């Protein structure tokens, strides 16, 4: 059985856009939680959410590749860039070796809803656009990143609610340990928008501490009142 090592890591989240920013946020106790006014407009009981800045990919990817990326794919792309950079994995290595990709992703609701809205309003499926299908599939991250980074190894998406990313890392470990793969890009990414979590809000699953956004997520507190969606 092979030993398995982590050679690089990348993070793009509500508490930082890279490892250094996340480290500083952890040292300073920054939660990255805030209020999303759009959720209140949609009738949400709780507008609390992790505030994740959408990356500007215009200088990093051509329009065709950007057009196929859903929101969570953008986050995953940025994290992957950092991970490969730390691991010193360049394009030449990716082209010459069989590198796999396993990503946890639980939904891609926004592109689906946006496409359906167009069809209902315009009565014309052609107006949905060519990129919609690649954004809508639950495999949107692994499908897009495998093309962008020339990944030719194992390729599938794992969906297991909040544990999706952890499952992906565990599965990558097992595949490398058993000798079935030599190198795998793995992790998790999730969309952060009102469409994907409306049902949770309706169930009363979210914290209602809108007056204390930074202190709302307190899973081990005896006075906890719910979770906070984030990414």
Language-model region placement:
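ACP-dependent fatty acid/polyketide chain-elongation machinery
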Residues: 1-65
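Residue-level preference for short coil/turn positions at secondary-structure junctions
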Residues: 2, 95-97
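Conserved beta-strand elements of the Class I
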Residues: 5, 100-102, 182-185
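Structured loops at beta-to-helix junctions and adjacent beta-edge loops in soluble globular domains
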Residues: 9, 104-106
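Acyl-thioester C-C bond-transforming condensing/cleaving domain
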Residues: 17-20, 30-36, 85-95, 106-231
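A glycine- and small-residue-enriched flexible loop/hinge segment at structural boundaries
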Residues: 38-89, 93, 103, 138-152
